[in-house]
């Protein structure tokens, strides 16, 4: 566990202005870009290009927490992992969707416990500590893998209310699962959502 002074020092590199132009990217001294929160989504976008080039008609590609649904119009059924279960194969709900990308970020994947406190891997850039938004997972659906991956992480940190304008801005929809097992589904995604497991409450 880092000391408070180490966390404060690391925060000095957040909110730094990164300059992007046609020649490349300029990163301020002492700042490091970590693309870990979008790598799986980018992989989905790259795979889609390969599928298109190979003239594949239909595919489901899972890259960890991101899924590419690729096809010719027929819908797919995707399970959303139960964030309270130890089993990664156990879902609590399902979505019926056309071709798109689906990404989930949650506090249940990578964490450690110390002194009775659970520390997960999704950090709040304002505090340097694990985000405390009342959420246990966020699943984002949109056309772009990179965007779905980035938004699922951002929405987890922001929390439900602050995420709504961001989702609207990028034309994305989401499923929010709270610590008390309540669930909120945004926009038209509600028509594609179905609870499968007892104990969860759709608000």
Question: Which residues does each PLM region occupy?
Answer:
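Mature catalytic core of soluble alpha/beta enzymes
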Residues: 1-203
